[in-house]
Amino acid sequence: MIPIAAITFASFFMGLGGAFTNSDTIKGLHLSGIINEQTGIIYVFQILKAAGEVVFKYLPLFFCLSASFGLAKKEQGFAALSGAMGYLAFHVVISQILKIQGLTADSTAVDFLKENGMSNINAYRFNSLFTTELGIFTYKMSIFGGLFVGIITSQIHNKFYNTKLPPIMAFFSGTRIVPIITLSIMSVLGAIMAFVWKPIGYSITD
């Protein structure tokens, strides 16, 4: 899959960038006169490191796009777009339900939990269930969440991308209806996952 190929280069960029932005490594290799802020070369390695980190930071989304695109029979671009929309809807719904339950980035922070009587181990354990995806506070599902949304989106796309609607609704025929259906289904699945993921997340982290 595309993300797996990207991981190879991302790892290379992170390794190279990380090594040559580390002051101990630079001094150990006697490259302080070359790799520094004056020559600007250190900035090149900082950029390489940042480029590699992007892939790992957004890996679940890339898996979602890859699954949506790769498993679609036709009109793969529309499938990938639907996957992205579905992924966002999925996590936004989870985030809103968590917020209703009083769970936010602040209220699940380790220090806050410890201040409110939770033990150190349980605080870290509970905190590990959550993350922020594209600025959305949600459950930490890693690449499973991306694949889950991507695979379902591809199945929705394959079933409905060639749908013909009555003339009065013809504008929404074909590929245009796929994002609408995807948003609806992923919103429902997001609501369900908001209530069932906690024990699953604990089983993974434990």
Q: How should these model regions be labeled?
A:
Residues 163, 178, 200-202:
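Transmembrane hairpin
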Residues 33, 158, 180-183, 202:
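Alpha-helical transmembrane segments and immediately membrane-proximal extracytoplasmic
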Residues 194-206:
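Aromatic-rich transmembrane-lumenal/periplasmic boundary elements in polytopic membrane proteins
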Residues 5-9, 13, 177-193:
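Selective recognition of specific alpha-helical transmembrane segments in multi-pass small-molecule
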Residues 155, 176, 195-196:
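A short, ordered amphipathic alpha-helix with a cationic face
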Residues 1-173:
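Early transmembrane hairpin of solute transport permeases
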Residues 167-184, 205:
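Membrane-interface loop-to-helix entry segments
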